[in-house]
């Protein structure tokens, strides 16, 4: 049986307080069912991914975006409602990139994925 590649579209969204970070994602990513997708979101050099709140959203055709993953650190991650445990996140400070990881890809994972960074404006 032939495996059909899944197409995962990546779109970026940015927010911030005083500085406006730029988030960069590739326009699309293809992966085979059962594989692990590693979706990157690279921050501009004026901010460090290490100490930032990263949010990931999933949007399927005809639906509103839904919170998929909140990720601050390895010990502070939270899946959105109904998101399977095969979803996780990681950060790579050397490349200033956050990653959304989806293991055991399934056809229902085909969607648009948005990353967002939140920087608290607390003084």
Curated annotation (Swiss-Prot):
Classification via Pfam families: V-set
SUPFAM superfamilies: Immunoglobulin
Location(s) in or outside the cell: Secreted; Cell membrane
Gene Ontology cellular-component annotations: extracellular region; immunoglobulin complex; plasma membrane
Residue segments, region Framework-2: 54-70
Region described as Framework-1: spans on this chain: 20-44
Location of the region described as Framework-3 in the Swiss-Prot/TrEMBL record: 78-115
Region named Complementarity-determining-1: 45-53
SMART domains cross-referenced by the UniProt entry: IG, IGv
Main location: secreted
Domain Ig-like: 21-123
Annotated stretches, region: Complementarity-determining-2: 71-77
Superkingdom assignment: Eukaryota
Summary of subunit composition and partner proteins: Immunoglobulins are composed of two identical heavy chains and two identical light chains; disulfide-linked.
PANTHER family the UniProt entry points to: IMMUNOGLOBULIN LIGHT CHAIN
Protein name as catalogued: Probable non-functional immunoglobulin lambda variable 11-55
Lineage of source species: Eukaryota, Metazoa, Chordata, Craniata, Vertebrata
């Amino acid at each position: 049986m032939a495996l059909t590649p899944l197409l995962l579209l990546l779109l970026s969204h940015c927010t911030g307080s005083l500085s406006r970070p730029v988030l960069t994602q590739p326009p699309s990513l293809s992966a085979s069912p059962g594989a692990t997708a590693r979706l990157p979101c690279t921050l501009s050099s004026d901010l460090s991914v290490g100490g930032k709140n990263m949010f990931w959203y999933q949007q399927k055709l005809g639906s509103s975006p839904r919170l998929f993953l909140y990720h601050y650190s390895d010990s502070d991650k939270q899946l959105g409602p109904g998101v399977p445990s095969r979803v996780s996140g990681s950060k790579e400070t050397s490349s200033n990139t956050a990653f959304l990881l989806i293991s055991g890809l399934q056809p229902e994972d085909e969607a648009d994925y948005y990353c967002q960074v939140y920087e608290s404006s607390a003084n």
